[in-house]
C-alpha cells in the first residue's frame, strides 16, 4: 500500500467540523488513532498490534472523513473492514457509525486465507481499538497490566504490591510498552527485552521506561542496584527475548515474575527471530516467508522453554494474551500451556463483577479536562480506594499521547456513575468540550477468546461467541454513538470475536439518558455472561437487584 505523506492530528477545541458531536467524536478519534504520537506506523494506517489498522487504505480513510463531515444527526455510516460502504437514515438515538472488521466465515478463518484477502484489499485487521477508533496509546493497556501485576502480588506473594521483586518480560511495542511503568507502579524492578531500539527510545521519551542498555550484564547490575536501594526501576534491554531468556537460564538466574508481551500472535510482523535485527528480519521475510516463519517458531519455542524452566525454579509466570503459548505449541512445544493465562489466573474475578478497562477522551485536547475528571473521581468514589490509588498514580505518572485520555478498571454501577458525572461536568462547563467514553474490547462481556479473556471458563463455554454479538446489538439499540464488532484481536485470526462501543457525553439531557442505558447494559451483560457460567460473585450482584433481569434467578 502506498504511504501517505504528512502527519494527521485530531482537531482540538469547541469548533465542530461536522454536523454533531457524535460525528465529531468519531472524526477526532479516527484521526487520533493515526497521530504520530499514538500510532505505530501512521503512514501505513497501522495503529498497534502487528498490523492493526484504523482504515483499509488511504482512499477509504479520506472517504470516511468526507462522510463523517456530511453525516446528519439521524443517519448511520456503515464501515465494512475499514471501508465506508453506506449511509442510511436511522434515528437520532441510533449509532452514528456501525463498524464490522475482519469477519470471516469460521471454516475460512485462518491466517493464510485472511491475509490473502487483506493483501487483495478485501478486508482489514482492526485489532481491538485500532479499527474501532478508540486507541489512546500505551495508557490503553497500562491499567490492565498494572491490575494483573497487582492481583499477582496479592495472590502469589500475599502483598499489596511487588516491592522487593523483579520482573523479566519482553516487548516494548504499542501494547507491551505499558509494562515498564506498570511494573514500577507496583513498586517492582523490571528488565524488559526489546529487539527494536526505536521502541526503547520511544518508551523513554514517553516516560514509561527509566533507562536502557544493550548489555545483559549491565541490565543485571542495574537490577541488583535497584533492588538493593529499594528504588523501583524499569530497565530496557536491547536484545532478543529468546537469547536473553536462554542466557539467564544458563546463568541460573531466576526472576520473581516472568512474562512476554511481544506481538507473537503475528508470525510475520510481531516477533523477530533470534539472530536477526529488525532490518535483516524484514529482508529475510521478503525473500523467504516460509523459512522466516520457521525461524520465528524456533525462537518462540526457545523462549517458552526458558519460561517453563523459570517456573520450575520458582518464578510466577503468565501468558499475557498475545497467543505466545499457542505459537510455542504450534512450534512443537507440547507443554506450552503449562504457562498459565493471565485472565483465569488474575483478571477473571474482576470480569465477574462487571469490571474492566473503561476509558474517556477529552475531545477538547485540553489535559486540564482530564485532570478535573480525575479530581472529581477522587472526591466522589471514596468507597473504592483501589480506584482512587490508580487515578492518583495515573495523574502523576502517565504521559498523554494524542488527545488526553484516562483509563481505569470500573465495575458494574461505577461506570454509569462516572459517565453521568462526566456529562454533568460538560453541561456545567467544568469540562471545556464533550468527552468520548468507551473501553477496550478486552472486557467483561464483550469478547469470546479461548486463549485469553474466556480461557478456562467455569462451565467450559470458552469458545461461545454469542456474547460479544449480543453485547454489540445491545449497545447499538441502547444508544451508543458507535459500535464495533471485530475478529482476531490480541490472539490472532480464528481465535477471538469481540465488540466495542463509544458514547459521547455532550452535556445534554439526551446524552444523559443514553449514558444511563449504555453504561448499564454494557457491563450488565458481562455480569450475566459470568453468572450464566456459574460465577458466584456475578450471581450475588444479580441477587442485589441491578437494572436488568436474569431469567434464571
Curated annotation (Swiss-Prot):
It catalyses: 4-imidazolone-5-propanoate = trans-urocanate + H2O. It is an enzyme of class 4 (lyase). NAD(+) binds at residues 49-50, 127, 194, 240-241, 261-265, 271-272, 320, 490. GO terms for molecular function: urocanate hydratase activity. GO terms for biological process: L-histidine catabolic process to glutamate and formamide; L-histidine catabolic process to glutamate and formate. Pfam families: Urocanase (PF01175), Urocanase_C (PF17392), Urocanase_N (PF17391). Binds 1 NAD(+) per subunit. It is found in: Cytoplasm. Transmembrane segments: none annotated. Its cofactor is NAD(+). InterPro entries: Urocanase (IPR055351), Urocanase-like (IPR023637), Urocanase_C (IPR035401), Urocanase_central_sf (IPR038364), Urocanase_CS (IPR023636), Urocanase_N (IPR035400), Urocanase_Rossmann-like (IPR035085), Urocanase_sf (IPR036190). SUPFAM superfamilies: Urocanase (SSF111326). The keyword Oxidoreductase does not apply. Keywords: Cytoplasm, Histidine metabolism, Lyase, NAD. Its main location: cytoplasm. The active site is at residue 408. The keyword NAD applies. Pathway: Amino-acid degradation; L-histidine degradation into L-glutamate; N-formimidoyl-L-glutamate from L-histidine: step 2/3. Its EC number is 4.2.1.49. One of its GO terms (cellular component) is cytoplasm. PANTHER family: UROCANATE HYDRATASE (PTHR12216:SF4). Catalyzes the conversion of urocanate to 4-imidazolone-5-propionate. Belongs to the urocanase family. This is Probable urocanate hydratase. It comes from Thermoplasma volcanium (strain ATCC 51530 / DSM 4299 / JCM 9571 / NBRC 15438 / GSS1).
Amino acid at each position: 500500500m502506498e504511504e501517505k505523506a504528512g502527519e494527521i492530528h485530531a482537531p482540538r477545541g469547541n469548533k465542530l467540523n461536522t454536523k454533531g458531536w457524535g460525528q465529531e467524536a468519531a472524526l477526532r478519534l479516527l484521526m487520533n488513532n493515526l497521530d504520530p504520537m499514538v500510532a505505530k506506523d501512521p503512514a501505513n494506517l497501522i495503529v498497534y498490534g502487528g498490523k492493526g489498522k484504523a482504515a483499509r487504505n488511504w482512499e477509504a480513510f479520506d472517504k470516511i472523513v468526507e462522510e463523517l463531515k456530511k453525516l446528519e444527526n439521524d443517519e448511520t455510516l456503515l464501515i465494512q473492514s475499514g471501508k465506508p460502504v453506506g449511509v442510511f437514515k436511522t434515528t437520532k438515538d441510533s449509532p452514528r457509525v456501525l463498524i464490522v472488521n475482519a469477519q470471516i466465515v469460521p471454516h475460512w478463518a485462518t491466517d493464510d486465507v485472511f491475509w490473502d484477502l487483506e493483501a487483495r484489499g478485501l478486508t482489514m485487521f482492526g485489532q481491538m481499538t485500532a479499527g474501532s477508533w478508540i486507541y489512546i496509546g500505551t495508557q490503553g493497556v497500562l491499567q490492565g497490566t498494572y491490575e494483573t501485576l497487582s492481583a499477582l502480588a496479592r495472590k502469589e506473594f500475599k502483598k499489596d504490591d511487588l516491592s522487593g521483586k523483579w520482573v523479566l518480560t519482553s516487548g516494548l511495542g504499542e501494547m507491551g510498552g505499558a509494562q515498564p511503568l506498570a511494573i514500577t507502579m507496583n513498586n517492582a524492578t523490571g528488565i524488559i527485552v526489546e529487539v527494536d531500539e526505536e521502541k526503547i527510545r520511544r518508551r523513554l521519551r514517553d516516560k514509561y521506561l527509566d533507562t536502557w542498555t544493550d548489555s545483559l550484564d549491565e541490565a543485571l547490575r542495574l537490577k541488583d542496584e535497584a533492588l538493593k536501594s529499594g528504588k523501583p526501576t524499569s530497565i530496557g534491554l536491547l536484545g532478543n527475548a529468546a537469547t536473553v531468556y536462554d542466557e539467564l537460564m544458563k546463568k541460573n538466574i531466576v526472576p520473581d515474575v516472568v512474562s512476554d508481551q511481544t506481538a507473537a500472535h503475528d508470525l510475520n510482523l510481531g516477533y523477530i527471530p533470534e539472530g536477526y535485527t529488525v532490518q535483516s528480519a524484514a529482508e529475510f521475510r521478503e525473500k523467504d516467508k516460509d523459512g522466516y516463519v520457521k525461524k520465528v517458531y524456533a525462537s518462540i519455542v526457545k523462549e517458552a522453554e526458558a519460561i517453563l524452566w523459570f517456573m520450575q525454579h520458582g518464578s510466577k509466570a503468565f501468558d499475557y494474551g498475545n497467543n505466545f503459548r499457542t505459537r510455542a505449541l504450534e512450534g512443537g512445544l507440547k507443554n506450552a500451556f503449562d504457562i498459565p493465562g493471565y485472565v483465569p489466573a488474575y483478571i477473571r474475578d474482576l470480569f465477574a463483577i462487571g469490571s474492566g478497562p473503561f476509558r474517556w477522551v477529552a475531545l477538547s485536547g485540553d489535559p486540564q479536562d482530564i485532570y478535573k475528571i480525575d479530581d472529581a473521581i477522587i472526591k466522589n468514589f471514596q468507597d473504592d480506594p483501589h480506584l482512587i490509588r490508580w487515578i492518583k498514580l495515573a495523574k502523576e505518572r502517565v504521559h498523554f499521547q494524542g488527545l488526553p485520555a484516562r483509563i481505569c478498571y470500573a465495575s458494574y454501577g461505577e461506570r454509569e456513575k462516572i459517565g453521568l458525572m462526566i456529562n454533568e461536568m460538560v453541561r456545567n462547563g467544568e469540562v471545556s468540550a464533550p468527552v468520548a467514553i468507551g473501553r477496550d474490547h478486552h472486557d467483561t462481556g464483550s469478547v469470546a477468546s479461548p486463549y485469553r479473556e474466556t480461557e478456562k471458563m467455569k462451565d467450559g463455554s470458552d469458545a461461545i461467541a454469542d456474547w460479544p454479538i449480543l453485547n454489540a446489538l445491545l449497545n447499538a439499540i441502547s444508544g451508543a454513538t458507535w459500535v464495533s464488532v471485530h475478529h482476531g484481536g490480541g490472539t490472532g485470526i480464528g481465535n477471538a470475536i469481540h465488540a466495542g462501543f463509544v458514547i459521547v457525553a455532550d452535556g445534554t439531557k439526551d446524552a444523559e439518558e443514553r449514558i444511563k442505558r449504555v453504561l448499564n447494559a454494557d457491563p450488565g451483560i458481562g455480569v450475566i455472561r459470568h453468572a450464566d457460567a456459574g460465577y458466584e460473585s456475578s450471581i450475588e450482584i444479580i441477587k442485589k437487584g441491578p437494572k436488568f433481569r436474569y431469567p434464571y434467578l
